[in-house]
Amino acid sequence: MADDGMLLNFSIPETGILSRPSLKGGNWRDRAAAKKAAQNWHTKASARLTGEKVDKVAKKTVENATDVNRTQLGQRTRRASKSPEVHEDIDRPAKRARVSGDFRPKSNEKSAAEAGDYRPQINPGATQKPSERQSAPKGAKGGKQVISSLFTYNPTSTTKTQAPEKRHDEEPIEPSNAPLSSELDTFTSLGISTTLAAHLLKKMDLKAPTAIQKAAITQLVKDDSDAFIQAETGSGKTLAYLLPIVQRLMELSANMKKHKDDDAVQRNSGLFAIIMAPTRELSKQIALVLEKLLGCAHWLVATTVIGGEKKKSEKARLRKGINILVATPGRLADHLEHTEALDVSNVRWLVLDEGDRLMELGFEQEIQKIVGALNLRMRGNKTRIPGLPDKRTTVLCSATMKMDVERLGQISLKDAVHLRADPTEREQEGDEPQDERSYAPAQLKQSYAVVAPKLRLVSLIAYLKRAFTRKGSVMKAIVFVSCADSVDFHFDILTSNLEEKNEKAEGTKDDTEEKADDDEPKKSTKKPKAIPQADPTKLSVTHAESPVLSPKSHAVTAYRLHGSLQQSLRTSTLAHFTKNNDAAVLIATDVASRGLDLPNVDLVVEFDPAFAREDHLHRIGRTARAGRDGRACIFLMPGPEEGYVDILKTDRKDNEAGITITRQDADDILTRGLVTSGIATKNAYMDIAQDLQLNVERWALASPARLESARRAFQSHIRAYATHVADERKYFDIKSLHLGHLAKAFALRERPSGMKAPGLRTGAGRNDRTPAKIRGANAAKIGSAPAAKKAVDLDIPDAKDTEEAAKMRKAVRAREKFMRHAGMADEFNLG
């Protein structure tokens, strides 16, 4: 070296020379894991050589790397610059090594914190010992927990927020489903008797008919032809077909009394009308309206036969005699086959309510069987009853004219008259329909909220808190979600006290206040107190006070409703929600979207968009009924879902095009709902929302049952997301979902790919609550019994439900097969 005139000065660092392995080949995930392991080994080896602590060595390594980059870049800048105006002491901004996804230079850390930037600076557990890292609480078995901020790396909206146009000459919107205001349009002018009209006014507070009631009553009272009633939700279709039936039966009874004083229509006179509805809840509601209507004709008797009830008690009521029957198709077909006391030879009216839903639920075969049985038994009875139609009159009610509804009309209708709200639109069957679409009520105020996946949960809570802030501003609200598991999860959150100190999981701290400490934290020897919380897998409580939503001035009651609840619980929940005169919120699936007339519902929130446009219209139709005002809001995520706004705009008729659908952002919702008092800073809502999210996550981690409920809700939500109709799947593409961000909306800190799939909910897919031993004994008896005796003696209320469950399982298996071929089996754990 010296012979060449060169002198090299090697400076060996204090830590010595440690070899760094070169990682090549293999998968990029394996290389990243090996690189991280080598870096941790190098840090610990340096700490052993210098005697310093691990975190200090890691910090020094980052600073040295930053200094080297600054020197090299500064020298390179000075060499490249030839201008004398450039000062040599001005270097290029420092370039720091990227650590844990931090893209900002070190010099900007302070300004970012002051500006309210919540992006993570450095991974607090990257240089900690295993004993110093945050341990997973009990019940959180599985993958590594990820605690991320709500306001980092959220997708940006693809549409721009437009300020609403102010129209000074805007006229008030007239309700499209309100009762007619003309003095000439009364029930008596339509052919209703004064006795029945007075009863409607005094007992039911109905002064005038709606447009669809006027068209239907005029036709059905005077004519015996079949009819197809098409009208928007909340327009009074139930009374449109009930009033003509009751009026004709009252006239029949009056005519019979004229000939014989003791002769009149009684319960043993025969069954004259059958009303079929797709769901049990709608059947119960129709029966309730019919019971009020028959208050002026006490000699007429009506009853219901629906799934989930005891067949023995239903048979007893049928033996006593009835005049009007409200039923679901599956149970009615079963009684027609096995109950001899059910005589349908005198049936003169058959009503199919919500015809589109009847076909969607797969009741086509049952309806064909019922219509065939009615035709066969009516031919056998050739006795003519004066005052009744000579043939059976069939009435089909539906909000849309889809292909399946037309097929149902071909099965049941013959020479039907098409009735609409506008009498000028009446048309005979076979004419080309003028408009096959259905629309939302004109007075309904619609809006949509663009909310990032991570902000969905806190935004929903903030939106509802804002709605119930003032007493009387919103009496009742309905929140629609996609699946039953999601209903249970959100109900448990709203009815829990998230701010209780004893609900923190063992080993967790306030994540926003955790600081790195040199000493190891002392392990607590105290066991956490038992939390008096019911198992969320047991569906026994369906309503409770909501501490999360209740302001100081009044309490808010939360309810839940879905198809997996027992029929008795579903009925009692709806009854309690209907009779409650205080503020209340109902979290439900689409089981509450069809035909239910729930009073004082001022707000409908579609937290999960409906699977089809028709379901969306039925959801928002739970408010703004019978001329009342109402509001509806749908939550959409940034990206393809924002294109769904074009579908929302088709909810209005052409003459209502001036009515705009307003937009809301997550920032506005959180600010209005969470920042309630005092002078708040610009980003104050971020701190409150972050604390609320952490409270929900700690609440979920505090109990294995809650954590299982959250996982089940997340996975069921993903499966339901993949079931949108083909025409709308471009807006709801499951491949565009960020599963990790969406998991945070379900209070989960685990990676979706490492999440274990829990089992089915208690009783899911099966309504029989008998023990397994008894079910096995009954199955053995069934196998040895004759076929004829099996059909008559067995009381199996869920026979039809089992068949429907089999159809649903077949559809789910087909969906799972599609997901596996699409490469999504790892996220859903379906393989």
Curated annotation (Swiss-Prot):
Q: Where is the Helicase ATP-binding domain?
A: 218-419
Which Enzyme Commission numbers does its entry carry? 3.6.4.13
Q: Which domain of life is it from?
A: Eukaryota
Compositionally biased, Polar residues: which spans? 65-75, 146-162
Keyword Magnesium set for record: no
PANTHER family named in the record = RNA HELICASE (PTHR24031)
Task: Specify the protein name.
Answer: ATP-dependent RNA helicase DBP7
